[in-house]
Curated annotation (Swiss-Prot):
SUPFAM superfamilies: YhbC-like, C-terminal domain, YhbC-like, N-terminal domain. It comes from the Bacteria. Pfam families: DUF150_C, RimP_N. This is Ribosome maturation factor RimP. GO terms for cellular component: cytosol. HAMAP family: RimP. It comes from Streptococcus sanguinis (strain SK36). It is found in: Cytoplasm. GO terms for biological process: ribosomal small subunit assembly; translation.
Amino acid sequence: MNKEREARKYLRLLSVRRCRHIATIVELVREVIEPAILAPYELVDIEYGKMGGDYVLSVFVDKPEGITVNDTADLTDIISPLLDQIKPDPFPEQYFLEVTSPGLERPLKTKEQLADAVGSYIHVSLYKAVDKQKVFEGTLLSFEEDVLHMEYLDKTRRKEVEIPYSLVSKARLAVKF
């Protein structure tokens, strides 16, 4: 029983260390490549982790009129040499670099991205329930003073809700059906 508890504790510690290491890699990559991604491009997000048996560094970029395959190829040519110059190499194993569009349901990770999304249909997950709900999908009417003001459908009735930014665990654009 005691060995089992120790094993669980050790696995949790490894998991925390791995998460911290991944967060450090993402922060370092952002610091190195963000200055090189010039207008009209926008660095939306960076993710690093295992996909199947391989490590993948995903760099999500966008521009106002949308990103093309040629754009991602050009940005890969800019980003890859910058990553190769990082010393010491922060990556524990070989990885694939993927420069891609954030897609239709792009994440909204910063206050600036939320402010830019006013008028858009979004999906929001919360740490704590507001009006007995932890998930909302609807139109972002405004984002002022760290409060999201949304309109959503509750069955067939339109409702409005105010959500403190501090309660938002994840937000992304959503496709309205």
